[in-house]
Regions:
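Active-site anion-handling motifs in enzyme catalytic cores
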Residues: 1-416
């Protein structure tokens, strides 16, 4: 069986997308180790054995980019045309012989929330699969929101044509069901679990000094915080595009200082999107700016974990925290799936749905609805009630992980 994995490029700098890639490949290979994978990324051409799974199996990377350089064989528009006319491009050749296309849309990008260019890129693999009669499996993901009718129609066409379509929570399943309308079939369409719950955690070869300190002194109480560069670095855009109603940098400062004032020995600022310096999405840049603005007594107890950890290594680090708070969806999933009591400051409904899947939806604070003062107070309350939160989370976690494994087995049976 040969599978093409789309919407999970491992070279974006977004560790959440990388987590989806590695978790999907690892789980499929655990069930069906003979599977051949072709992973669509942002590179050039097809590169056999350029990717290694966590089990060490070599997989092919194949360039597939949304670009205006239509003459390039790794441009999605070129790939789409080549498949129609039997063209010779390396990526189109790999797709043509696929048993199925597994598409995960970056977990949360099957929406017009991030603009038409992102949605166009997200739609390409789905359209390619349907146009070439390649079975399309929409892995557990968020569907919507869709503010405009045209994107909604595109999405409806894709989900109706898919062999299988899974939402990653009950809230998003409602959107999926609405898109399907009378095409809904409970044998093909289901509410599932984000595959990142299955991501293996791996201890890094090199540990940050702050992490070394925690390992040598397990009694040290550490609050882990993921600061989203997407929201922190451009507050004007955050308000206009995502409806952020509060002062996000102020909430993050309040959270750091209040946790240190009420029981935390240290705060780790843990980036989950490692884009180049100056990029508006950089969590690392946001974390450094936040720490620099703190008064010295706080600053010396706050550590920016700026090591170049991969998705599994950063999950291992997050798992050493006594409590975690994040805005990046997969930073919080890394914590939840490690059994760490976790809160979230959310800018879309996707977060509530995933937290509800493990029974802790009350740990989500909506940045679109709460004031700066109210959000700060609510997050601090989640910090104080972390032990009770941990008990509820861990009572559900085993069942969620089992469900994630069962859904992949079901998908592979459907693909055959």
């Amino acid at each position: 069986m040969k599978l093409v994995l789309a919407g999970a490029a491992p070279d974006t700098g977004n560790l959440g997308v990388s987590a989806l890639c590695h978790a999907t490949v690892a789980e499929v290979l655990r069930i069906a180790p003979e599977t051949e994978f072709v992973i669509l990324d942002n590179g050039e051409g097809a590169r056999p054995s350029a990717f290694r799974s966590t089990s060490g199996k070599a997989c092919t990377l194949a360039g597939a980019k949304s670009s205006r350089r239509y003459w390039r064989s790794d441009c999605f528009a070129n790939i789409r045309a080549s498949l129609r006319i039997g063209g010779p491009g390396a990526t189109s050749r790999e797709i043509r012989t696929a048993s199925a296309i597994f598409d995960i849309s970056g977990g949360d990008s099957f929406t017009d929330l991030y603009g038409p260019r992102r949605l166009k890129a997200i739609m390409y693999p789905k359209q390619i699969a349907l146009e070439n009669d390649i079975p399309l499996v929409l892995l557990p993901q968020t569907y919507g929101p869709f503010a405009s009718e045209h994107p909604r129609r595109l999405a409806a066409t894709a989900v109706r044509g898919a062999l299988r379509a899974y939402a990653r929570d009950t809230y998003s399943f409602g959107v999926l069901s609405d898109l399907l309308g009378d095409a809904f079939d409970p044998r093909r369409h289901a509410s599932g679990v984000d595959v990142a719950f299955l991501l293996p955690a791996l201890q890094p070869a090199e540990l940050a000094p702050a992490v070394e300190t925690k390992l040598s002194n397990p009694a040290q109480v550490v609050a882990g915080i993921n600061v989203s560069g997407l929201i922190y670095n451009d507050p004007v855009r955050a308000k206009s595009q995502y409806g952020i109603a509060l002062d996000y940098p102020a909430v993050m400062r309040d959270l750091v200082t209040s946790t240190l004032d009420t029981g935390a020995d240290a705060v780790w600022l843990i980036p989950h999107v490692m884009t180049p310096p100056g990029h508006y999405e950089s969590d690392l840049e946001a974390s450094r700016d936040l720490r620099a603005g703190l008064a010295p007594p706080y600053r010396e107890r706050v550590h920016v974990l700026d090591h170049q950890y991969n998705q599994s290594e950063v999950k291992w680090v997050i798992g050493k925290c006594d409590w975690f708070c994040g805005m990046r969806m997969h930073a919080t999933i890394a914590a939840l799936s490690s059994g760490v009591p976790t809160a979230a400051l959310a800018y879309s409904g996707k977060t509530m749905g995933v937290f509800a899947s493990v029974g802790v939806e009350d740990a989500v604070v909506d940045a679109r609805k709460e004031s700066t003062a109210a959000a700060s107070e609510l997050l601090l309350e989640r910090w104080h009630t972390r032990n009770a939160l941990a008990q509820r989370l861990n009572a559900r976690l085993g069942d969620v992980v089992s469900a994630a494994r069962d859904q992949m087995s079901s998908i592979l049976r459907a693909v055959g």
